[in-house]
Amino acid sequence: MTSASQYLYDHVTTKVLMDDMSFGDNAPRPGGRLPEFDLATVDGERISTRDFVGRKPLLLITGSYSCPMTASSDPVLKELYKKFANEIAFVMVQVREAHPGEHSEQPRSMEEKIKYARALKMRDELPWPIVIDDADGGLHHALDEKPNALWLTNREGVIIYRALWAGDDTGLQQALDAVCRSRAPALQDSSRRIVPMAMGIGKMREMTLQSGPRAAHDMWRAAPPMAAMAWLADLYRPLPPKWRTVAAVATLGVGVTVIASLLKKPRNR
């Protein structure tokens, strides 16, 4: 477990980004149970793990206002919510800010955390409740501190599926279908990165600029290739996030091809 000062970072670092790329050994996993919680929502109600055991499957998602992965996966989750909301409870946990900056500083009080959760719910028009983790991230620590992961439990409260990134809609779709039929999903543990990361990179510059210049600068320092791809993808902002990144990769490929062909041309003597 990280210390309070490490957990509530003010600058994204290479280590933070690398830690996000895989579940730790102690992360809740299929066959186990979620850590118990009883937390307030942005609407002033309370939600507990006990509310769902024996009654309804639960999809628990981590997210934050400044997180590009959250911003890019929320539209996908909203489409799934339309299909499964009557049978499965969707709940998001407001955790630490993924990309703090001058406009979205790392919250160190419950009041600040509630403010960001409300802003997230309003910006993305989220139909599900958001519960507020404590200022020091007690629940987030127990969930392995991932920025936009999710866990799906069955009616008995047993985890039947987890995903490192909520944007893996293919994996999640089959898991939601399975739990509605009281079956185990074919895929129970997803660490797929390509599609979720393409979506997140497509939103990254937009989200870091929202947080402030410091957040944008931190990405250039922590992961220059990713920051460069995000900058290029942002030029295609009218497109959906995933296709912004696809367009950026295509543009980069064309550029490299042109440069390579120019270098191969014989020089006139």
Q: What is the role of each PLM region?
A:
Residues S66-C67, R96-H99, D136:
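Solvent-exposed loop/turn segments at secondary-structure junctions
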Residues I47-L77, A89-Q94:
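Short active-site neighborhood of thiol/selenol oxidoreductases, capturing the structured segment around
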Residues V91-V93, V131, W151:
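Hydrophobic/aromatic beta-strand patches that form the interior of the parallel beta-sheet core
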Residues K56-L58, N86-A89, L126-W128, P147-N148:
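Loop/turn elements at helix/coil->beta-strand transitions in domains of secreted/extracellular proteins
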